[in-house]
Swiss-Prot record:
Involved in the caffeine degradation, which is the essential first step for assimilating the carbon and nitrogen in caffeine. Catalyzes the oxidation of NADH and transfers electrons to NdmA and NdmB, which catalyze the N-demethylation reactions. InterPro entries: 2Fe-2S_ferredoxin-like_sf, 2Fe-2S_ferredoxin-type, 2Fe2S_fd_BS, Beta-grasp_dom_sf, FAD-bd_FR_type, FNR_nucleotide-bd, MRET, Riboflavin_synthase-like_b-brl. PANTHER family: CARNITINE MONOOXYGENASE REDUCTASE SUBUNIT (PTHR47354:SF1), NADH OXIDOREDUCTASE HCR (PTHR47354). Keywords: 2Fe-2S, Alkaloid metabolism, Flavoprotein, Iron, Iron-sulfur, Metal-binding, Oxidoreductase. This is Oxidoreductase NdmD. Its EC number is 1.-.-.-. It comes from the Bacteria. GO terms for biological process: alkaloid catabolic process. It comes from Pseudomonas putida.
Amino acid sequence: MNKLDVNQWFPIATTEDLPKRHVFHATLLGQEMAIWRDDSGSVNAWENRCPHRGLRLTLGANTGNELRCQYHGWTYESGTGGCTFVPAHRDAPPPNAARVNTFPVREKHGFIWTTLGQPPGEPISILDDAQLVNAVKTNLHSVVIDADIDGVVSVLRQNLSAFIDVFGAASAEDLHLKSMLQDRGILVTRSGSIAIHFYMQRSTISKCVVHAQVLTPGRPGYELQKNYSYAMNVIRRAAEAVATDLISITDISDQTIEKLEVVRENMTKAPPTHYICEVVTRTQETGDINSYWLKPIGYPLPAFSPGMHISITTPEGSIRQYSLVNGPDERESFIIGVKKEIQSRGGSRSMHEDVKVGTQLKVTLPRNGFPLVQTRKHPILVAGGIGITPILCMAQALDQQGSSYEIHYFARAFEHVPFQDRLTALGDRLNVHLGLGPDETRAKLPDIMEIHNAQDVDVYTCGPQPMIETVSAVALAHGIAEESIRFEFFSKKNDVPVSDEEYEVELKKTGQIFTVSPGSTLLQACLDNDVRIEASCEQGVCGTCITPVVSGDLEHHDTYLSKKERESGKWIMPCVSRCKSKKIVLDL
């Protein structure tokens, strides 16, 4: 028996199987999956299991940008599958470790494709007849057959006569069959005028799904589809009859074990936590901004959603966060923009000076601390400088789905505007404001806000800290609710606050006790005492080092926690925040 190579793309659904806010149940090689499309058009292929209690996610609710399990209400975001909300802990950030297993997914040729391995390329069409390139493509209904895929292919080969009426042929001799993709793709044609693609999906060792697409000079009529249904019933009955006979006369226990071993070989359930990416394109967007296209080596690009960022280890060793600029259909490489900061501590300078086409960089799985939330309100997108990157990603997604929105970009001058082609493509949704100083910007913002009812808009803003503070203040003054104002900082200008007095730290779970000395941060004291806390920006911006607190009088200096989270006293960003009392107890 030939081994099945799982490092390839498999069809698991048709485009029509994913209507708005639906979750589709599919099975590939014994792996159950929940397939769903978010409101930006991105498709997700997830393991059909909630990480919390194991309930099938196909029983859950597609809320537009997230999938909610119906058992305890845990919610997972489109793209990464990361948990975003736990109803039992409403005031706490979701657990970082709670993430649905995700699979690479593509939407091509009218089908949804996924893989359990690491395919080297993209899904391919089996069409090779030049006369049919411009034909009308119509997906026919998929047929589930209780038989092994090899048996179905064999029956299909032997029963082409069942399709005579479908093709309007005189006899089976007028039909031509070609097998591709290791018998998973069958192309049947009649003299170049009509063709049907059959794509075989191996659900389990004893069940397969036959997907089909007909190519015709014009839109196929009712008769063709009726005749196709009749023909596929003939194929299904014949294949299942053969399978039943084999089961009744053969001891297949050994074959079953062998097949399961073949199916599971080299399977990869989820993408890695980080990638090695090669720089395939580097473009100078402005005098101080470059864009980079980073293609993962050995893995397809993971699913992602607007507002996500990746962390990159730069050639000189710094870890920096960069927002994705990708449009919804750009699924080959991570696309980022990097501004060379005058006072760079090494990150942006290294990206500009050391990174060339061909350079390999370590990149994390995308995270989303700035999601585009589907609220049915009108999004006002406001960006300044390099803050355009996540805002542009959001705008492209909204534009593709035909949503109402507007984008305002504040820049020093036209020559300082990056991604000009992408921005121009947004048409009259784009408003560029050039050469405005801080006072002029503050004067302009009320004009933007006041033409809308405060209850009908969401505000998203990203850029320099003073600008974000100004946008937030103007929006609040206009009556826009705080929870409808969302922002992301790239960096803070303030120096990292350090302790001016010694205080004690106790770890509740281990009982360890140590002190934070004057001139040190809580994070540094933890690391010095072998307390492992993951950290990244060390400026209170990214949220990576968020740490639970049991007790202590906290002094917050971050921009990550919400006002409600700060007031709860349950969380601290140890990279910049500190304790005002003599002792802090961490829930570690």
